Amino acid sequence: MSTLKPTSSKNEEHAHWGGVFAMTLCVFVLIASEFMPVSLLTPLARDLGVTEGLAGQGIAISGALAVLTSLSLSRLAGNMDRKHLLLGMTILMALSGMLIAFAPNYLVYMTGRALIGIAIGGFWSMSAATAIRLVPQHQVSRALAIFNGGNALATVVAAPLGSYLGATIGWRGAFLCLVPVATLAFLWQRFSLPNMPGNTKTASRSTVFRLFRQRVVSLGLLACGLFFMGQFALFTYVRPFLETVTQVSPSGLSLILLTIGVAGFVGTLLVALVLNAAFYPTLIAIPLLMAVIAGALILTGHSVWIVALLLGFWGMLATAAPTGWWTWIARTLPEDAEAGGGLMVAVIQLAIALGSTAGGMVFDRSCWQSTFALSGMLLLGAVVLTLLLSRLHKSLAG
């Protein structure tokens, strides 16, 4: 069983850092493309002649296609060279931007959004497996942190950049601006990524769900799912909390959200060092500290400066956490990281949906304190499961 083996890397000598940074640029464009409609929804809907609600479904369809792709790609790709597969996903990303920019109607717009969903699911499901093949084992967490840095940076700039470009050159021009950056990412990956043949041992296996037969995988994915549920049960409703409870000004709101994003970017730069020193203690400490922050926000929600400080710390922890869980996939399933990555994408997407939905129901029917308390309880559940996971992993390895 791969879970009983020490972590191995397909590449023990050469580090292809050019490929890592090329993929990070690809991550940046992917995330910017995924969330660009958020800041352009009103003019987009008006131009296509649909309601804002229908236009917003473009985000939903990209998420749904990301899940379906992540669960099926490893099997469908077979022995295909993973370099060619990544390049194909980058082409889909560029094509998506062009389709949306020139969409004459709602159907073409949704087709473009579906393509970006396929690219997102395909890329993230392969990220851990690709990191294993690009750098030596002791640098895998650093490579994954760099990938996630592109994610964090895009999260910070996508909405304000989209809003600015939309006001300057129109929403179509904003989407079109992503195409040359995607083309640059394609060319950079083309010349910096090594050939990465498909794994003939895993390509012929049954679906990714077979991994649930391994206790350590089931427990780990459950812990990961609870973490993301807890995170988004709270974070989805940060804006109404800041506006109605903390009562920040519009400029103050923007500043706090920017602080969260910048702190998250810093977190991704630091987390690799911490993970290498203390892997499971870090995975346990992150949700524990976030649960403490959720409780502290309940007690100090009316103090602007304390809330800003707490949410900045929250952003640093929450954005660093995915690097930890992707590193867990790379360490736990070094020979099956693609299938494990596919399951991870699906679990995270489902957890985000469940967490935000549950948080919203509590927010509407009870009060914001109950929503934050729910988040804290889910995060504490993740702490308990991660602690059990570390003990199980230790017993299996021993």
State where each predicted segment sits.
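Conserved MFS/SLC helix-loop-helix module at the cytosolic interface between two early adjacent transmembrane helices
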Residues: L68-P104
